[in-house]
Amino acid sequence: MKNGIEAMITDITATTAEAEDYTGEDGLLYCGKCHTPKEAYFAEGKTCFGRDRHPAECDCQRAAREKQQAAESRQKHLEKVEDLKRRGFTDPAMRNWTFEHDNGRNPQTETARFYVESWETMQAENIGYLFWGGVGTGKSYLAACIAHALMEKEVAVCMTNFATILNDLAASFDGRNEYISRLCSYPLLILDDFGMERGTEYGLEQVYSVIDSRYRSGKPLIATTNLTLEELQHPQDTPHARIYDRLTSMCAPVRFTGSNFRKETAQEKLERLKQLMKQRKESL
């Protein structure tokens, strides 16, 4: 057994030499490429089964190892981010809504970027955003940009809407508490198109349950809505008042103004279509 252990340790402490390697003046094996030691002596007077040296990384071995580790780390990061995005967006179209694809015309882009840059503070102090304003002013887009940027930092975000939530709850009523708990487990929850859900008694009760649970979780919430701040601050009835009171206490209001980007995009497509038709006509 002893001979077997000695053989194993000898193999471990032995250094494999390449053809271009050489022995330096200090008696150690040197790399023929980077000319740094591939061995190191044990502390003075110390040996291991008669050997006074052990393998060491030369500079090029270290560089190769670090490069490999960086590649593996990068791959793990990409896989993690891809999984977060797959799970985090209920609308696949939103996966292309990023700061990189933003045209820079929305004046609230910097406000959205600030949230990402200040995420640790926003999370610690439970600060959310309430993006409110007219249809097509970029509220959902910038909310998705925030989600993407945080996911790139490996922060789990769920961006959904109450139409989806209510459908999910109706389909799995027995797991209602578990479903809401899962929503509240995300470090950041984004509710898109808030206020557009059906206003039935059941629907409003579920909306309040989600908002209230998120409030009690102490985790930030971002919501987008076409409702005005006036409508949110002066609701029409008690059920809406309960919901809006919770929402406005969690989220700082951010107003979105300006032109309807969707209408502009539609107009651009129409003009492009006319141009293509004209080109075809001229080519005939």
What are these regions (language model features)?
Residues 1-103, 264-284:
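A short, basic N-terminal segment
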Residues 60, 104, 162, 256-258:
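Active-site donor-binding loop signature of nucleotide-sugar glycosyltransferases
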Residues 95-129:
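Pre-Walker A (pre-P-loop) alpha-helix and adjacent loop at the N terminus of AAA/AAA+ ATPase modules
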Residues 107-116, 124, 147-188, 198-205:
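Short glycine-rich substrate-engagement loop in P-loop NTPases that contacts/grips substrate
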Residues 123-143:
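Walker A/P-loop nucleotide-binding motif
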Residues 127-131, 187-189, 221:
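Generic beta-sheet signal
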Residues 193-194:
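Walker B catalytic acidic pair
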